[in-house]
Amino acid sequence: MKNNFYQEDELLSNELSNRGFLLTKVDNVIGWARANSLWPMTFGLACCAVEMMQAAASRYDMDRFGMLFRPSPRQSDLMIVAGTLTNKMAPALRKVYDQMAEPKWVLSMGSCANGGGYYHFSYSVVRGCDRIVPVDVYVPGCPPTAEALIYGLMQLQKKIKRTTGFKYDTRQTH
């Protein structure tokens, strides 16, 4: 009986594919749309921002991934934190993050944004932007190359596709 069910399912699948039907879940379509139309907002703080600009230029062209840089946090769904985050800049980072609409994602770019980097032991440096905002993807390097940033963005796209469509992120920060 079990084999009969699978045979009928396979016959139905073949019949539908021959006629040109597409079967999917709404959550999969929403995840695909969100992953392929990211609108990043730059939060460039140091030298990593130069590599981020290079990734957006013609040689690497982040536009082919559906990414359109937005100047306003209210129009963007991805924040790229690139560079050294100081104690004085941390409240501004949190304020900009709070202004972004749901669902929102954060990519931490470079050693300084990930954990303080070269300035880790300085009194004025936050030891990782994940102490201020929840981070989805970390891109290592000092500074990371444009290829590393694009790889991190592709990993974020995979993560977005894995999440369900109607459930928003409920992460809490201190």
Swiss-Prot record:
GO molecular function: 4 iron, 4 sulfur cluster binding; iron ion binding; NADH dehydrogenase (ubiquinone) activity; NADH:ubiquinone reductase (non-electrogenic) activity; quinone binding
Cofactor note: Binds 1 [4Fe-4S] cluster.
Top-level taxon: Bacteria
Pfam family, one: Oxidored_q6
InterPro entries the UniProt entry points to: NADH_UbQ_OxRdtase-like_20kDa, NADH_UQ_OxRdtase_20Kd_su
Catalytic activity: a quinone + NADH + 5 H(+)(in) = a quinol + NAD(+) + 4 H(+)(out)
GO biological process: aerobic respiration; electron transport coupled proton transport
HAMAP family documented for this protein: NDH1_NuoB
Name of the protein in its database record: NADH-quinone oxidoreductase subunit B
Organism expressing this protein natively: Rickettsia massiliae (strain Mtu5)
